Amino acid sequence: MLRIAVQSKGRLYDETMMLLEEAGIKLNRGKRILLLSAKGFPVEVLFLRDDDIPQSVANGVADIGIVGENEYVEKGQEAKLIKRLGFSKCRLSLAIPKDEEYKGAEWFEGKTIATSYPAILRSFLEERGVKADIHVISGSVEIAPGIGLADAIFDIVSSGSTLVSNQLREVEVVLPCEALLIANNNLSKEKLEILDELLFRFEAIQVAEGKKYVLLNAPKEKLDEIIEVLPGMKSPTITPLANDEWVSVQSVIAEKHFWEIIGKLKSLGAEGILVLPIEKMIV
């Protein structure tokens, strides 16, 4: 049995639960239940505060964890980074009152900065040769300048709307963050095998993100040109049709290039274009 530590609530919790469900790990969580066994897969899920996950994985309370990069870097625990998961993206940034003129990190010299991430902030200031007072608070960091508690803040930024509503502006991005999969350094052979299977499932989900499965009918005389347009995983799949002058073509394309590619296919005579979503992809 492999124990996974995940955040107990919030955006990271929601996106983690979605990933686990897509990976075939089914959970029925009650409000007060902190440890749950999954159905159909040898894992159990431990629900914790995000900032407790790195230590819990490092000391073996949990075998692996899904945690925000901000907490993983801040805590500096001896847990191994296994995989970047690509969701819950945000950034740790410095922000100052919006009307202040900013020309560089020297602005923070002698200032007081409020934060919940003192270790990361201290490292940044030392690299820049800036001496500032760090005021550690937990929660509602963004209000600190407005109530005279600090001159600036160092905090998580997603959309930036919270900064705007508190008359602040972002001036330095210190650490881009996303969800990470981390693991204890001393997992047994059995647990490593379960982790490998879990990674296989996660990667199949990630590879499929932003991809579309395309089926179309193509005139044989234009087939070579159509194949050049379609990227495919290796090469498009070509299937004969009852009409000898036409073939069926199947391929995978990136959604960000979808309309550009579809336009080219139509101009080359492709017909009956069918586009399907892809849930998972094994490569």
UniProtKB/Swiss-Prot annotation:
Domain of life (superkingdom): Bacteria
Gene Ontology MF term list: ATP binding; ATP phosphoribosyltransferase activity; magnesium ion binding
Any single GO BP term: L-histidine biosynthetic process
Compartments, as annotated in UniProt: Cytoplasm
Pathway info: Amino-acid biosynthesis; L-histidine biosynthesis; L-histidine from 5-phospho-alpha-D-ribose 1-diphosphate: step 1/9
EC number(s) given by UniProt: 2.4.2.17
Regulation of catalytic or functional activity: Feedback inhibited by histidine.
Co-factor requirement: Mg(2+)
SUPFAM superfamilies listed in its UniProt record: GlnB-like, Periplasmic binding protein-like II
First-tier enzyme category under EC: transferase
Keywords noted in UniProt: Amino-acid biosynthesis, ATP-binding, Cytoplasm, Glycosyltransferase, Histidine biosynthesis, Magnesium, Metal-binding, Nucleotide-binding, Transferase
One CC-aspect GO term: cytoplasm
Reaction(s) the record says it catalyses: 1-(5-phospho-beta-D-ribosyl)-ATP + diphosphate = 5-phospho-alpha-D-ribose 1-diphosphate + ATP
PANTHER family: ATP PHOSPHORIBOSYLTRANSFERASE, ATP PHOSPHORIBOSYLTRANSFERASE ATP-PRTASE
Function: Catalyzes the condensation of ATP and 5-phosphoribose 1-diphosphate to form N'-(5'-phosphoribosyl)-ATP (PR-ATP). Has a crucial role in the pathway because the rate of histidine biosynthesis seems to be controlled primarily by regulation of HisG enzymatic activity.
Stated family: Belongs to the ATP phosphoribosyltransferase family. Long subfamily.
Name of this protein: ATP phosphoribosyltransferase
